[in-house]
A protein has these predicted regions:
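Class II aminoacyl-tRNA synthetase-like tRNA-binding/catalytic domains
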Residues: 2-119, 127-131
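Short acidic (Asp/Glu) and glycine-rich catalytic loops that position anionic groups and cofactors
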Residues: 5-11, 124-125, 260-262, 284
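Generic recognition of stable, solvent-exposed alpha-helical segments in well-folded globular domains
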Residues: 18-25, 29, 137-144, 148, ...
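A translation/RNA-centric and nucleic-acid-associated enzymatic feature enriched
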Residues: 109, 179-309
Length: 309
């Protein structure tokens, strides 16, 4: 059952017509700014992939994919849940070099999503991926990319306020980002659930990048589920903002430096997913045939929620 609510006494800053205009403006401005900032080029994205390739996102490993068979060839296809793995292969196939990347307008169906104000069966994302050097696989590099994305959000917001004066009563976000690991967050709030920890910290500190998601913490449990075959769990995170109308933190982007052959090898075993080693994508990563990359997804709908109040 959906848990979507409209907060008491909530009044939108824009009427319905201007809201639609503003949504289009946000999508255009942010995509252009993100591409300029990270040196990305738009490519077309698939709506579905062959199940046998291992390219679909398994999310937490329990969500059912929308699957269908194709009459021509008897191929089993799956509607994408994200393009996390597809993008890395595409960078190789398209011949992208170090320092350049791609982004897609990704549309997905997640049939097992729990519905609320922030989650839908239909998922839209700017899915992006960029080729990096092996020596760029560091926390410092990851943090610099996070700061670049937040700066793109702030630049979009300032332009939006200039175009829609009705939004000028909303407070502007700053480019400042607080970085904290999931273990540090658990140590700070040991008696709270992971989501309660996020809410408490982001309400106090504002824009936050929560790092190192996927591996078990000292408590024996991971902060949140994360697939073992695209993000390096030591070099990933969620970009969190405070949502004032909903009075909660929420994730604008999940992103990270992608697995090396060594980290995929370790994480597949940790997650009990060694059977995936036989899939074409996983073979390619383990053999070192795919480029080192960083990437993530950014939700246009969530960005509009953030900037339109």
């Amino acid at each position: 059952m959906s848990k979507t609510i409209i907060p008491a006494n909530y009044t939108p800053a824009l009427n319905l017509y201007d809201t639609q205009r503003a949504i289009g403006t946000v999508k255009r401005l942010f995509a252009d700014t993100l591409c300029a900032t990270l040196n990305l080029y738009r490519v077309s994205a698939p709506l579905f992939v062959e199940a046998s390739t291992g390219l679909n996102d398994d999310l937490n490993g329990v969500e059912r994919k929308v699957t269908f068979d194709m009459k021509d060839g008897g191929i089993e296809a799956q509607v994408v849940q994200s393009l996390a793995k597809w993008k890395r292969k595409a960078l190789k196939d398209y011949g992208f070099r170090v320092g350049k990347g791609l982004y897609c307008d990704m549309n997905a169906i997640r049939r097992d999503e729990d519905l609320d104000n922030l989650h839908s069966v239909y998922v839209d994302q700017w899915d992006w991926e960029k080729v990096i050097r092996e020596e760029d696989r560091t926390e410092a590099y990851l943090k610099n990319v996070v700061r670049s994305i937040v700066s793109a959000v702030c630049a979009t917001e300032m332009n939006l306020h200039a175009m829609f004066p009705q939004l000028q009563d909303l407070p502007l976000h700053t480019p400042n980002v607080t970085f904290i690991t999931t273990q540090e967050l658990e140590d700070k709030y040991p008696d709270l659930t992971p989501k309660e920890r996020e809410n408490a910290f982001v309400k106090e500190n504002g824009t936050t990048f929560l790092m190192k998601i996927g591996a078990p913490l000292k408590s024996g449990k991971p902060h949140d589920g994360r697939a073992p075959d695209y993000d390096d769990w030591d070099l990933n995170g969620d970009l969190l903002f405070w949502n004032e109308p909903l009075q909660c933190s929420y994730e604008l982007s999940s992103m990270g430096i992608r697995v090396s052959p060594e980290s995929m090898d370790k994480q597949l075993t940790m997650a009990g997913c060694d059977d995936r080693r036989a899939l074409p994508f996983h073979k390619a990563v383990l053999a070192g045939e795919l480029p080192y990359t960083i990437g993530g997804g950014i939700g246009p709908s969530r960005l509009c929620m953030l900037l339109l109040g």
